[in-house]
């Protein structure tokens, strides 16, 4: 199968060249796409809102919902990450916010290496993990 991305939709073509499945962007603009971990993650922009869409490898919707404005999306086995102007945001498969990690410079790209998230910003590569629980609030 081949995944083709057009201005207004994603199309999955079979070995014979026929269209097997498609997903319409609904008038939104494609910002970013990631095809790791058994499916497709789309980041769409529709004016003031950004939408994250998780599709399985047959382009069936697993999740679709509004998310903070971002420049990149990374599909993980257990959810997805968004790279914004100043943070990395983590969401589970149901689109529920998990954590945020501030970055010193704007994240320009990210790579998932197994369960490790590597983020490129400025001239550095940084491994990003969930923040440690705040122990100062424990009494």
Sequence positions of predicted segments:
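Blade-level signature of beta-propeller repeat domains, shared across WD40, Kelch, NHL, RCC1
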Residues: 102-139
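A short beta-strand motif characteristic of beta-propeller blades
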Residues: 18-24, 58-65, 96-101
């Amino acid at each position: 199968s081949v995944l083709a991305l057009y201005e207004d939709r994603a199309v999955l073509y079979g070995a014979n060249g026929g269209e097997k499945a498609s997903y319409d962007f609904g008038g939104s603009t494609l910002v970013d796409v990631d095809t790791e971990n058994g499916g497709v993650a789309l980041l769409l922009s529709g004016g003031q809102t950004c939408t994250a869409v998780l599709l399985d490898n047959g382009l069936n919707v697993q999740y679709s919902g509004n998310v903070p404005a971002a420049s990149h999306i990374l599909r993980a086995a257990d959810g997805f990450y968004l790279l914004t102007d100043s943070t990395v945001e983590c969401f589970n498969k149901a689109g529920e916010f998990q954590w945020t990690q501030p970055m010193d410079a704007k994240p320009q790209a990210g790579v998932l290496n197994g369960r490790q998230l590597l983020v490129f910003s400025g001239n550095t590569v940084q491994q990003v993990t969930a923040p440690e629980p705040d122990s100062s609030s424990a009494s």
